[in-house]
Amino acid sequence: LVKMQVLLLSLIMIVGIAIQLNNAFYQIEIGHYLFDLFAIHLIGFIIWAFLALFVQSIFNNTYLSLFLLILLALGISQFPSLGIENYLVRFNESPDSSFYLNYSDMNGYGHSLLPFFLYRFYWLLFGIFIYFFTLLIWQRELTNSVFERLTVAKNRYRGKLSFTLMISLICFLSFGFYI
């Protein structure tokens, strides 16, 4: 999934450069393209990919999983209207990214990169946790219900996978308390 996201972001960069050249703007900032697409946006896409793998492993129905992911993506934007203002509970969100990540030639992103990357790292830790949890419940044999998958996951919970799952959960919670 990550390779596909990198490929699509590279395509966006190539098309953006082509549009700039077509409009006779020859001051192309490759570094800015690379940083914006691969350092800022790719992290969020990877976190969503972890969640997509998790939801797909829970439900057998592909369309139901896709619907739930779309519903979650649309629902997160409505959290402030429900009174949920804290970014620690709003999945893959960082503090007011429309304000914080405005780029200017004078000072770049300014003071806004540190809080943005802190929240991205926080949600990346959660993504790593759900990735390892997904490995526990991944359907390797024929199971019909979520309960059966959780039973299989309970039997698989040992060794390096359980250690990594616990470490990622502890890191996620610790970093959440730090922020």
Task: Please provide the spans of the model-predicted regions.
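Alpha-helical transmembrane segments and their helix-start/interface "positive-inside/aromatic belt" motifs
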Residues: 52, 59-71, 160-166
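Residue-identity detector for glycine
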Residues: 16, 31, 36, 44, ...
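Secretory targeting signals
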Residues: 2-60, 100, 115
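Bulky hydrophobic/aromatic packing residues
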Residues: 1-2, 128
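Alpha-helical transmembrane segments
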Residues: 12, 16, 49, 128-132, ...
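Terminal transmembrane helical anchor/hairpin motif
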Residues: 25, 63-137, 141-152, 179
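Hydrophobic alpha-helical membrane-interfacial segments at the cytosolic entry of transmembrane helices
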Residues: 3-11, 68-74, 167
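Internal/C-terminal transmembrane anchor helices
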Residues: 151-179
